[in-house]
Every structure is written in structure tokens, then in C-alpha cells.
């Protein structure tokens, strides 16, 4: 079979799928998916080239089958009597005479392939394929249409690590393993060329390749290289198929590989054809921007919560570990504590620790089941709560047993641990969604409509504002904090954006203080994580308010800075209930109570809990903790959720449905968002926070503007890039010069530099993360130099985006650091994500990524870069490969900025010199009106979303009102037509570039200008009784028209655009978009509105029904202060 058969001269069309659908999702609204006709063409419409067409057997003349059929068709298009049988027979005969040539690609794969053919593409050259010992399947070393080879793709996705080469390959049937220790994890294996010719030695990265004993046998450990580079096995080990072979092979996309791997988990013998079966790949409904009512809201979010719950359960219940060795101890509360480490595997301890910490998110309070399976004692099972997780000091996990009865404390071996999955948090989210839908009293009418995205007139709460906004016991507030507190107290729904170091916690505590002083019952304060709740609880307590910290019962044994405020500890100290104290003392001493005493103890405890909660000024708990049964019968008028951008929307709803009439969301959508483990749920929108959606709906957050954390030189770049230059410095350069610290910065007045490192990335032992040994060595040298210069270990933080690098750094510091091991143990090494909300005096950032083809992964996420750059108070040092990083526009800006500041350096640390490396000129988001936004600024949404019909950024409406309060976007920071190619490149832009200005709120009954009351806009109410909210404030049906709409009669203009409302826009006619100062002809001729850009928009907005259709028409006539 000749190569030409597949070349340009062949008559066979071969269609190759690209990975674009994997990246952007299929364009189901595009023209190729349009409904045309799902029936066979009529005989009179037979296409050219078919039977009867110009190229068919009955062709050019009048004599084909179609022609003969036509002759017998009557005037009304009905076949005459007797003609049917003849025509069918003749057509069948003609079709039988046709010789259809089978596509060679099809025949290539319909014939029986050998057993060792690649399970993805079918390539079966013995030199090119590798056997996966775990899944019992063969894969080739070719990339096909994916970024890595098929074997590496499989190993990573299936979490397999052991392989065997083919017996007919150049190296024979060989299991790849370490020559020294027998480790078979291919992600750990590498080779050292031996002195003898044509001999290589396979050794694992750690510990074997780093042992000093290698020198004794003439092996140079510095020459060690991994077997897998650029996500492919080295070609001398496993041959890479030729380009022709790969073109002839079955074409499979990354998206299909993903689906096939998922299918193999359930059915190992599944094939690509099985993917086509109905129901195999059902995608959940995507979240919307607006919802008709709370039932639709529940019907969309409920399945996503279930998806995440199912994924979480499957992951945690699959992680059973045998052969555990336990160390027993007795806690201060007389409870048994079991200490254990995860067993050593071929990949070393790192692999399992990563899975338990990163994938399973093991944390204090989680439940673990410990079983004894040996012969030295009776079989036993006990449940305990985790009280210690692995850290820099060791990999030990500790659990406190609920009951010590029968615990085999005399034995230490042959134990098994299982993760006990609990559905509590997911059940509470589902319950909150249901409550929101069915319970009228769950939230006020105003908040109900706002959360669903309905148009509601803004209102102001009449309240007595304090004369002095600073709370007692807390620092004085700056101007932006005072404005935030003052505004929030007067509004039913507020968003506060707190960039890094701007005093978000102090501001939140001050708001809670003033809300509590109003005497409207306890204020509920929540956050997604226990650490964030504890920090805020501590600050609120400083104001002198009565604060109760409500903990999950599984966390009562865990110590925290605010343990004395915890409900269970406050009950212990209640002098008003002596009987309860006696029973508690008896329980502590004996460990158990009689059934009668236990019953009495629980009743008294419930009474005490209720009394403390009812009398508290403030109750603090996690968002999921707000679903605790102890709060079930309480109603909270005022609710504040801190770090709300790190919570999923259903998580936020758990506290919200406890009666919210005044809701304050605090967060920063320019930092990292919620963690969603299930990719399908994340892709459907569960990873978008409520805060973000409300911002897109046009509720403009109040931004805190003075930062008190960073040296001014450190805050300049994040301010310009992420916050449009709006951050002011509350500290001077002199405030951020450390006394007794002698470190030579390349620029003495700028405590920062980018240290150019040319090392290569490697896949970590888990197969799902990366590490960079050269960077790790440089990080150790920098850490040592900082310590010698006078920095204390606990003042230094090392952060990296990759768990593999974090784990490698911990081990490298211990074994290769030139100072005492204990010093390095006190240096915190963590992922960027784990450092959010934290700060250190000095931060070292290891970027890790350095490759030719793979890109830079989630370093691409601007929010991750923002978090990484804003953790330091006194100095930042970035270690990375500029060549790889500069390909991404945002990093290009960062590197160019460091070069401008003469802080891009290379060479030995004691003699740093400015790097001569040159970068292409950064692409700028040109904004002539607002020079402060000259950098490519960022947030969660990119330029394409500025034209989503239905969002606040929709520019489709004509005839903009002139009144400045009712414009749909800010004239000062509009996006000009010039940089619109940015949209096609996915370059993020800031919210403020398309954000509407904040209109003045209206008091109840206040008219908005001379046109007030001139019409009633269309409204949507989710449930009866929502027309009036619980303030007695006007619902959406009582909104008034702004004066700019006085000349338009709503009834006669059903599709006219209201002040801040969104109308229907056809994505097939982007030229209808309007911008101030830009006429229609100008815009319609602009190059970026060509087919390429249009198709990208269509792909991104494939959930077209989210924004268009009947709902868009309904919104078309709504007017008033719609977004606030």
C-alpha cells in the first residue's frame, strides 16, 4: 500500500479532529449543527455525482435511474400505479453494479490488529509500543493529535506507573526498573551513561541517583536524565513512530482519550466505538447567568453538587491502604491516638502522601477507619478523627479514636486504613437549594430576585449610622474602608473586593461590629475554610462582642487560636448549669456515662447550646457548618460571608437561606476561586463563585484600595496588572527595610529579582505533577543565603504551583541543604493555592515549567500569578526559565517589567549580573482614555464575554441613554475597537473595563427623576409573595423608570432596551454591537469581526440558551435601575 494513497494526490478525504473542541467545547450552536433535513434526499434531488448525476453510472445523458424514475412521476409528484416495483428493482440493480472503494484507513483497522497494537491509535510496530503492566494494554510512543505520547497519556490518566517493552523490540522483553533498588515507577526512573560504551544504567531519581556511593563505581550522578522527556519516552528506549505511520493510524483526540479512559474504569474492554453509544457521555446542564425562578436554580445546581459528591466518594473510598504500622499514644483527654505513616511504595512515600493531601484533601477533622487484620489479637475496627496531617517535619498522620474499647494497643503491625466518606457537606448544600426554592422565609424578596439575576430597583436600608466607623479594639480605618462600611450598612446586598493586604478582615470585623450593635439579633459570619473563620472570629472578639465559634463535632478535639470561643468549650465554663458541669466532669474521668446519665447530659447540653447561641452577638462557622442542626431553627437577618470567592455557589447558599435580609459577600475574584474536584462539574460552571456571577450581573464590588502588606516596589506590578493601578500603598519603602538583614539585592531600592534558571522540567513520581531539579537546587542556595543574611526560617515561604516540586523541595532541603536540617524544616514550603490568604516576609517562587512543546500549564492562570506575587512583605525572588514562560503574554509582561527594573539576573548568587535575554514586545491592551489600564489586566472573564447577550457587558442595545447614572458601561474605561484581537487570543481583561458605574441607590418611595412611575416594566417572580420583600420594600413589579426613558412607552416598545437591561443579540451578526464613539460601519468593517473571531465567540457561548430565547426577549422590556 503506497504512501501516496494518503497524500494530497489521493481521492480519499481524511478528516482529522483537532483539539479545539477539547479546549473550547463543541460549537453546538454553529452552522454545522443547524437543523437542515434528517431525511433522505428525494429522488428528484439526487446530488451530482450520485446515481443519475453527472458523474454517476446513468450520468450526463437522460438515462440514469433518477431520470427513469422522473419519467414515471405524475404531475402531483406521486408515482404512477405499477411504477414503484419497477423503479425499486432498477435502482437496486444499478446500486449493485456500483463498485465502492473502501477507505484504506477503514480497512487498515477493520482487519485484525495484533494484540500489541496501541489501544488508542492501532500502531503496532514492536519497537514503538509499550505494555502497561497495570491495565494490561499496549500503547505507542507517538503523539498523534495530543501533546504527549499515547503511553504517557495513558499512564498519567490511569495513574499507572509500571511498563514492559515488547519482546521483538530492540531491547527485548524488559521490565523497566531501577538497577539499584528495583523501583518500577517510570516517572522516577532515569539513566546514567556508564563509562563502558553502549551501556546505560537505569536508576530512580531518589534516593539511588543522588547517593554519594555512585562515585565509587564511576557513575556521575550529575549526568542523570529522566526516561520520559517532553511527555515522551526517550527515542532510543522506545522508538517514536514516523509521521507517515501516525497519519495512517486511527486519529484520536485528547477529548476522546479522556472519555475512553473514563469508560475503561467501568469496562476495561471498551473501545472507541462505545463512545458513540447514547448516554455514554451525557454532559450536565451548564450554570446560567440568570434564572427564571429558584426551582430552575435548584434543578441546575442540584445535579452538579451530586456529580461532585459522587466523584469525591469514589475517590476517597478507593484509597484503602494495607500493611500500616501504628504507634499508639494516650491523649490528654484519655482518648487513644494512633499515629501512622503511609506505606513505602515503588515511588517512595511521596506518591501516596500527594494523593491523600492533594487529591483527597485530607485535613484535620476527617474520619479514618482503622482495622486490625493480624493474628496476634482479635480482629478489630475503630473510627477516629484526623488530628494531625503530614507537614515539613514528617509524613505522620494521627487519628483520635472515638472509642478505645477493644483497641489492640499491644500490637503495631498489620493494620489497614480506609477513608470514611461523609455526605454531610453535600447534603447540606442540596438542602439549602431546596429551601431556597420552597421556603418563602428563607431570604428576603429583594435578595431572592437579586440572586436569580432579576431586575430589581435598588434600595437603601434606613438605619442609624454610627458617628465613628472604626470599631473599638480594631485599627483605624482608611478612606476606602470607611466608604465600604458606610455603604454596606445601608444596602441589603453588597460585594466587597479586598485585594491582597488591604485589611479585608479588619473591614469585615468592623461591619459585623456595627451590624451587631443595631440589635437585630445575632449576626452570622461564615467563610469556606476553618482557618478563615478562625482569623475573622479572633478579630471580631477584639471588639468586645459576645462571639460563639460553632465547630463541627468532628473538630472539637482540634486546637485553634479561638478554641476558648468554641461552643463546646463555652458550655464547659457555664456556671449557670452546675449539673451539666458535674456530668461533664464524670464523663471526662470515666470516659462513659450510664444510659440515664447520658440522656440527661445530652438534654442539658442541648439547652445550654441553645441559650448560648440565642444570646450571642455573633455566631461564626464555616459555610457548610451553617447547616448544623443546632442553627436550624434560628433566623439571621444579617449574614456576612468572607472569602466568598473561594466557595462554590451552593456552598454560599447554605448560610444565605437562614433568613438573609442583609447579605455581605467579601472576597477577591482576581485571586484563586473554589476547588472543584470533578472536571465535569467544574466545566459546567460549579467552579464559578456566587460573587463572580453577581459581578457579571452588574453588581459592582466596593474595592478596598490601600494595601499594608507589600514593599511599594512589590505592589506596583500586581496593582497595574490586576487592579488597574488602583492600589495605594499604606506602607513606605522605609517601613519595609528589615533591620539586621544584610542581603544584596540587584537593585538596592527594589527587594526583588527574577533568577534566570535553564533547568528542564520532569514529570514527578505521581505522574500528574512536575518538578525541576535545577530550580530546586537554586531555591536551596537562595534560602541558605537569606538565612545567612539574617532572615529567620519562619519568615521565609517557598511556594510553587506543583505538588511534585513541593515534595521534591522538602526532601532536597533535608538532604542537600548546607545548613542544619532543623532550619530548613521551619521554612514553610507549600503550593500557591495553600498560601492564599497568608503572608511571609520573604517569598521564593519556583515556577517549575521549562519545555519546548507542553506550555506552562496552570501557571497560565493569572489569578495564580496574582496570589504568588502578593504574599511577600519585604522581598520576592522568582526562580524560573524565562524562555518558556515568556511565550505566555501575562508572563511576558512580568519578565519585561523585571527587565525594565534591572531585576532580571543570572550567574552565581554572590555575583549576580543583569541578564541580556531579550523578549518580544508585550502585547498591550491599549486604552487611550485610561492610561492606567495600559497593561493587560485580568480577572475571571475574557474579552469575548463582553458581548454575551444578557450579561451587563452586552453592547447590543442601540440609543444609549445620556444620563451618566444609567449607562451600561463606564465611558472612562471602555474597550476600544483596536485591541479586539485580544478576544481571539483568550487574553483576560479586567472587569472594570466593561463595568457599569454604580448608580445612586433609591430610598423606599423615592422617585427617580421626572419620569418616575411612567410605566410598569415586565417582571419575573419566582414564587407568590415575592412582589414585596420582607423589608416592605418594592419588589420588581414596583420599579420606576429612569428619566432617560421618559420618552419611550414601554408597552409600545416591547423590545426596547432599558437603562441597564440586556436585549437579544444574534451572535451571527456581531456588527450590530455598538460602542460609544464608534459608528456601525466602522465596527462592521473591523477585521476582528471576521469568521474566525465570530466562530470563537460562538464556541465560547455554545450554551446559547443561557442568554437568548424567550428570556432575552422578556428582559428586553425591563427598565429601571436593573442591576442594583
UniProtKB/Swiss-Prot annotation:
GO molecular-function term, one example from the UniProt record: ATP binding
Enzyme class name: hydrolase
Compartments in which it is found: Cytoplasm; Cytoplasm, P-body; Nucleus; Cytoplasm, Perinuclear region
Effect of inactivating the gene: Embryos are viable in pre-implantation period, show complete loss of NMD but are resorbed shortly after implantation.
Annotated spans, Disordered: 39-69, 1004-1053, 1066-1091, 1105-1124
Entry GO terms, CC: chromatin; chromosome, telomeric region; cytosol; exon-exon junction complex; nucleoplasm; P-body; perinuclear region of cytoplasm; supraspliceosomal complex
Biased composition (Gly residues): 51-66
Residues annotated for Zn(2+) 2 binding in this entry: 132, 135, 154, 160
Biased composition (Polar residues): 1036-1053
Residue numbers of Omega-N-methylarginine PTMs: 1014
Parts of the chain that traverse the membrane: none
Binding site for Zn(2+) 1: 118, 121, 140, 150
Superkingdom of the organism of origin: Eukaryota
Keywords (A to Z) from UniProt: ATP-binding, Cytoplasm, Helicase, Hydrolase, Metal-binding, Methylation, Nonsense-mediated mRNA decay, Nucleotide-binding, Nucleus, Phosphoprotein, Repeat, RNA-binding, Zinc, Zinc-finger
Region described as C4: 178-208
Record SUPFAM superfamilies: P-loop containing nucleoside triphosphate hydrolases
InterPro entries: DNA2/NAM7-like, DNA2/NAM7-like_C, DNA2/NAM7_AAA_11, Helicase/UvrB_N, P-loop_NTPase, SF1_C_Upf1, UPF1_1B_dom, UPF1_CH/ZBD
Principal place of residence: cytoplasm
Reactions accelerated catalytically: ATP + H2O = ADP + phosphate + H(+)
Pfam families with a match to the protein in the record: AAA_11, AAA_12, ResIII, UPF1_1B_dom, UPF1_Zn_bind
Chain residue ranges for the region called C3H: 118-150
Annotated binding of Zn(2+) 3, by residue: 178, 181, 204, 208
Functional note: RNA-dependent helicase required for nonsense-mediated decay (NMD) of aberrant mRNAs containing premature stop codons and modulates the expression level of normal mRNAs. Is recruited to mRNAs upon translation termination and undergoes a cycle of phosphorylation and dephosphorylation; its phosphorylation appears to be a key step in NMD. Recruited by release factors to stalled ribosomes together with the SMG1C protein kinase complex to form the transient SURF (SMG1-UPF1-eRF1-eRF3) complex.
The family this protein is said to belong to: Belongs to the DNA2/NAM7 helicase family.
Subunit structure, interactors included: Found in a post-splicing messenger ribonucleoprotein (mRNP) complex. Associates with the exon junction complex (EJC). Associates with the SGM1C complex; is phosphorylated by the complex kinase component SGM1. Part of a complex composed of SMG1, DHX34 and UPF1; within the complex DHX34 acts as a scaffolding protein to facilitate SMG1 phosphorylation of UPF1. Interacts with UPF2. Interacts with UPF3A and UPF3B. Interacts with EST1A. Interacts with SLBP. Interacts (when hyperphosphorylated) with PNRC2. Interacts with AGO1 and AGO2. Interacts with GSPT2.
UniProt name for this protein: Regulator of nonsense transcripts 1
Organism per entry: Mus musculus (Mouse)
Gene: Upf1
Amino acid at each position: 500500500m503506497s504512501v501516496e494513497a494518503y497524500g494530497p494526490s489521493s481521492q480519499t478525504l481524511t478528516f482529522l479532529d483537532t483539539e479545539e473542541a477539547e479546549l473550547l467545547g463543541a460549537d453546538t450552536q454553529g452552522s454545522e449543527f443547524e437543523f437542515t433535513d434528517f431525511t433522505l434526499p428525494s429522488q428528484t434531488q439526487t446530488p451530482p455525482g450520485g446515481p443519475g448525476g453527472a458523474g454517476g453510472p446513468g450520468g450526463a445523458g437522460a438515462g440514469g435511474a433518477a431520470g427513469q424514475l422522473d419519467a414515471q412521476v405524475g404531475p402531483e409528484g406521486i408515482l404512477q400505479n405499477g411504477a414503484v416495483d419497477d423503479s425499486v428493482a432498477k435502482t437496486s440493480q444499478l446500486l449493485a453494479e456500483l463498485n465502492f472503494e473502501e477507505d484504506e484507513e477503514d480497512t487498515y483497522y477493520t482487519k485484525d490488529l495484533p494484540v500489541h497494537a496501541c489501544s488508542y491509535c492501532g500502531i503496532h510496530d514492536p519497537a514503538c509500543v509499550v505494555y502497561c503492566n497495570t491495565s494490561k494494554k499496549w500503547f505507542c510512543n507517538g503523539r498523534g493529535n495530543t501533546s504527549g505520547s499515547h503511553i504517557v497519556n495513558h499512564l498519567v490518566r490511569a495513574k499507572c506507573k509500571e511498563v514492559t517493552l515488547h519482546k521483538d523490540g530492540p531491547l527485548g522483553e524488559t521490565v523497566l526498573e531501577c538497577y539499584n533498588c528495583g523501583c518500577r515507577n517510570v516517572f522516577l526512573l532515569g539513566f546514567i551513561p556508564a563509562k563502558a560504551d553502549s551501556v546505560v544504567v537505569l536508576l530512580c531519581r531518589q534516593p539511588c541517583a543522588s547517593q554519594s556511593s555512585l562515585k565509587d563505581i564511576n557513575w556521575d550522578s550529575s549526568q542523570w536524565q529522566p526516561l520520559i522527556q517532553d511527555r515522551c519516552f526517550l527515542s532510543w528506549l522506545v522508538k517514536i513512530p514516523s509521521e507517515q505511520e501516525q497519519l495512517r493510524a486511527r486519529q484520536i483526540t485528547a477529548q476522546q482519550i479522556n472519555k475512553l479512559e473514563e469508560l475503561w474504569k467501568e469496562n476495561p474492554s471498551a473501545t472507541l466505538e462505545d463512545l458513540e453509544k447514547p448516554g455514554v457521555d451525557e454532559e450536565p446542564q451548564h450554570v446560567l447567568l440568570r434564572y427564571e425562578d429558584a426551582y430552575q436554580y435548584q434543578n441546575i445546581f442540584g445535579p452538579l453538587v451530586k456529580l461532585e459528591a459522587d466523584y469525591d466518594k469514589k475517590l476517597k473510598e478507593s484509597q484503602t491502604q494495607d500493611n500500616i504500622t501504628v504507634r499508639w499514644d494516650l491523649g490528654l483527654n484519655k482518648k487513644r491516638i494512633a499515629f501512622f505513616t503511609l506505606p513505602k511504595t515503588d515511588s517512595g512515600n511521596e506518591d501516596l502522601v500527594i494523593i491523600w493531601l492533594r487529591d483527597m484533601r485530607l485535613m484535620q477533622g476527617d474520619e479514618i477507619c482503622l482495622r486490625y487484620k493480624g493474628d496476634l489479637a482479635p480482629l478489630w475496627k475503630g473510627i477516629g478523627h484526623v488530628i494531625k496531617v503530614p507537614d515539613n517535619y514528617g509524613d505522620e498522620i494521627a487519628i483520635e479514636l472515638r472509642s478505645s474499647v477493644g483497641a489492640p494497643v499491644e500490637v503495631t503491625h498489620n493494620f489497614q486504613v480506609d477513608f470514611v466518606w461523609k455526605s454531610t457537606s453535600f447534603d447540606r448544600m442540596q438542602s439549602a437549594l431546596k429551601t431556597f426554592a420552597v421556603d418563602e422565609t428563607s431570604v428576603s424578596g429583594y435578595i431572592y430576585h437579586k440572586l436569580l439575576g432579576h431586575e430589581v430597583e435598588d434600595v437603601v436600608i434606613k438605619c442609624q449610622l454610627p458617628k465613628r466607623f472604626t470599631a473599638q479594639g480594631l485599627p483605624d480605618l482608611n478612606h476606602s474602608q470607611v466608604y465600604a462600611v458606610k455603604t454596606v450598612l445601608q444596602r441589603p446586598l453588597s460585594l466587597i473586593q479586598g485585594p491582597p493586604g488591604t485589611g479585608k478582615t479588619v473591614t469585615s470585623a468592623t461591619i459585623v461590629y456595627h451590624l451587631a450593635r443595631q440589635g437585630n439579633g445575632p449576626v452570622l459570619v461564615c467563610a469556606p475554610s476553618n482557618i478563615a473563620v478562625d482569623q475573622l472570629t479572633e478579630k471580631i472578639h477584639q471588639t468586645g462582642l459576645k462571639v460563639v465559634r460553632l465547630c463541627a463535632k468532628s473538630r472539637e478535639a482540634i486546637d485553634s487560636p479561638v478554641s476558648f470561643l468554641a461552643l463546646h468549650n463555652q458550655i464547659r465554663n457555664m456556671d449557670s448549669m452546675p449539673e451539666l458541669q458535674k456530668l461533664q466532669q464524670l464523663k471526662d474521668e470515666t470516659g462513659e456515662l450510664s444510659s440515664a446519665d447520658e440522656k440527661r447530659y445530652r438534654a442539658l447540653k442541648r439547652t445550654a447550646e441553645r441559650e448560648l447561641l440565642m444570646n450571642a452577638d455573633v455566631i461564626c462557622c464555616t459555610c457548610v457548618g451553617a447547616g448544623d442542626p443546632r442553627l436550624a431553627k434560628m433566623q439571621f437577618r444579617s449574614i456576612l460571608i468572607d472569602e466568598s470567592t473561594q466557595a462554590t455557589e451552593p456552598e454560599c447558599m447554605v448560610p444565605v437561606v437562614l433568613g438573609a435580609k442583609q447579605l455581605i459577600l467579601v472576597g477577591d475574584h482576581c485571586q484563586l476561586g473554589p476547588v472543584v474536584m470533578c472536571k465535569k462539574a467544574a466545566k459546567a460552571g460549579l467552579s464559578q463563585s456566587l460573587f463572580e456571577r453577581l459581578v457579571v450581573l452588574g453588581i459592582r464590588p466596593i474595592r478596598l484600595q490601600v494595601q499594608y502588606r507589600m514593599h511599594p516596589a512589590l505592589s506596583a506590578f500586581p496593582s497595574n496588572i490586576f487592579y488597574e493601578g488602583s492600589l495605594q500603598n499604606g506602607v513606605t519603602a522605609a517601613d519595609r527595610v528589615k533591620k539586621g538583614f544584610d542581603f544584596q539585592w540587584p537593585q538596592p531600592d527594589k527587594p526583588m529579582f527574577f533568577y534566570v534558571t535553564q533547568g528542564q522540567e520532569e514529570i514527578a513520581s505521581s505522574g500528574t505533577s512536575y518538578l525541576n531539579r535545577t530550580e530546586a537546587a537554586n531555591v536551596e542556595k537562595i534560602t541558605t543565603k537569606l538565612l545567612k543574611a539574617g532572615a529567620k526560617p519562619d519568615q521565609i515561604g517557598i511556594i510553587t504551583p506543583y505538588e511534585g516540586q513541593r515534595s521534591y523541595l522538602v526532601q532536597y532541603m533535608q538532604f542537600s541543604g548546607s545548613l542544619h536540617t532543623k532550619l530548613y524544616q521551619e521554612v514553610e514550603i507549600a503550593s500557591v493555592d495553600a498560601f492564599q490568604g497568608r503572608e511571609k516576609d520573604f517569598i521564593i517562587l519556583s515556577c517549575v515549567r521549562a519545555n519546548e512543546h507542553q506550555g506552562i500549564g496552570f501557571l497560565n492562570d493569572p489569578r495564580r500569578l496574582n496570589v504568588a506575587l502578593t504574599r511577600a512583605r519585604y522581598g520576592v525572588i522568582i526562580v524560573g526559565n524565562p524562555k518558556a514562560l515568556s511565550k505566555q503574554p501575562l508572563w511576558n509582561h512580568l519578565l519585561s517589567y523585571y527587565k525594565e527594573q534591572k531585576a532580571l539576573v543570572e550567574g552565581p548568587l554572590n555575583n549576580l549580573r543583569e541578564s541580556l535575554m531579550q523578549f518580544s514586545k508585550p502585547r498591550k491592551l491599549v486604552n487611550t482614555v485610561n492610561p492606567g489600564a495600559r497593561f493587560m489586566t485580568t480577572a475571571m472573564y475574557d474579552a469575548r464575554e463582553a458581548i454575551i447577550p444578557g450579561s451587563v457587558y452586552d453592547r447590543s442595545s442601540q440609543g444609549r441613554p445620556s444620563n451618566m447614572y444609567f449607562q451600561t458601561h463606564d465611558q472612562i474605561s471602555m474597550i476600544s475597537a483596536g485591541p479586539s484581537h485580544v478576544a481571539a487570543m483568550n487574553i483576560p481583561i479586567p472587569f472594570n473595563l466593561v463595568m457599569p458605574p454604580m448608580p445612586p441607590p433609591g430610598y423606599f418611595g423615592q422617585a427617580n427623576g421626572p419620569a418616575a412611575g411612567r410605566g410598569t416594566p415586565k417582571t419575573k417572580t419566582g414564587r407568590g409573595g415575592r412582589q414585596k420583600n420582607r423589608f416592605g420594600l418594592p419588589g420588581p413589579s414596583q420599579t420606576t423608570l429612569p428619566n432617560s426613558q421618559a420618552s419611550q412607552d414601554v408597552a409600545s416598545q416591547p423590545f426596547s432596551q432599558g437603562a441597564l437591561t440586556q436585549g437579544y443579540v444574534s451572535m451571527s451578526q456581531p456588527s450590530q454591537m455598538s460602542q460609544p464613539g464608534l459608528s456601525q460601519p466602522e465596527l462592521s468593517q473591523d477585521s476582528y469581526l471576521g469568521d474566525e473571531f465570530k466562530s470563537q465567540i460562538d464556541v465560547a457561548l455554545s450554551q446559547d440558551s443561557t442568554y437568548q430565547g424567550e428570556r432575552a426577549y422578556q428582559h428586553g422590556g425591563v427598565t429601571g435601575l436593573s442591576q442594583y
